[in-house]
């Protein structure tokens, strides 16, 4: 069986609000759409944290569980939980094989977490990952910069994924947006 791709996640902090959006498409290999309604963005830690994944679906579930465990262990401290998870992910021979990336955020902090040990906080309050990530990132930056007072974080997140879905064949328009 081929590789499964779970595609685009976009997150934004904007005017005191935060939102994360993900599309619903799961693609096997380069040819077959297997699912249109996957849910790739979740609320964690009593609804105080958002997390979204791009990459292998099975690996993402493992990472969600691991990250939620770290949040519990560090009492909701997002940065500490992300750093400790990245250390464990990078240091464990089996976990290193996982093929996924995560964006995690709370009301004040947004982080990209990867299996190579990176924990990156963006300078501009915007992150995007997955096959349509660059398209969503570009759209989100333009929307945030040029329509800032006219759009909410949720509207920016939704519009950025819509634009990515128009361009990227691995991103669809079944968009789920979560807010904190």
UniProtKB/Swiss-Prot annotation:
Q: Does the keyword Cytoplasm apply?
A: yes
Q: What's a single GO MF annotation on this record?
A: metal ion binding
| Annotated positions binding Na(+) | 165, 168, 171
List localization entries: Cytoplasm
PROSITE patterns the record matches: PROTEASOME_BETA_2
What coarse category fits the chief subcellular location reported for this protein?
Answer: cytoplasm
Q: What is this protein called?
A: ATP-dependent protease subunit HslV
What organism is listed for this UniProt entry?
A: Bacillus cereus (strain AH187)
The gene coding this protein: hslV
């Amino acid at each position: 069986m081929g590789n499964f791709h779970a595609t685009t996640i976009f997150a934004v902090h904007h005017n005191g609000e935060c939102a994360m959006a993900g599309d619903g498409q799961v693609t096997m290999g380069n040819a077959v759409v297997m699912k249109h309604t996957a849910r790739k963005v979740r609320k964690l830690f009593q609804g105080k944290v958002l997390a979204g994944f791009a990459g292998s679906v099975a690996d993402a579930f493992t990472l969600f569980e691991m990250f939620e465990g770290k949040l519990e262990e560090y009492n909701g401290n997002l940065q500490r939980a992300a750093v400790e998870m990245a250390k464990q992910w990078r240091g464990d021979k089996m976990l290193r094989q996982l093929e996924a990336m995560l964006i995690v955020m709370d009301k004040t902090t947004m982080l990209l977490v990867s299996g190579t040990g990176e924990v990156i906080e963006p300078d501009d309050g915007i992150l995007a990952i997955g096959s349509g990530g660059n398209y969503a990132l570009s759209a989100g930056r333009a929307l945030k910069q040029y329509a800032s007072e006219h759009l909410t974080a949720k509207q920016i997140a939704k519009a950025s994924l819509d634009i990515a879905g128009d361009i990227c064949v691995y991103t669809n328009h079944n968009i789920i947006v979560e807010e904190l």
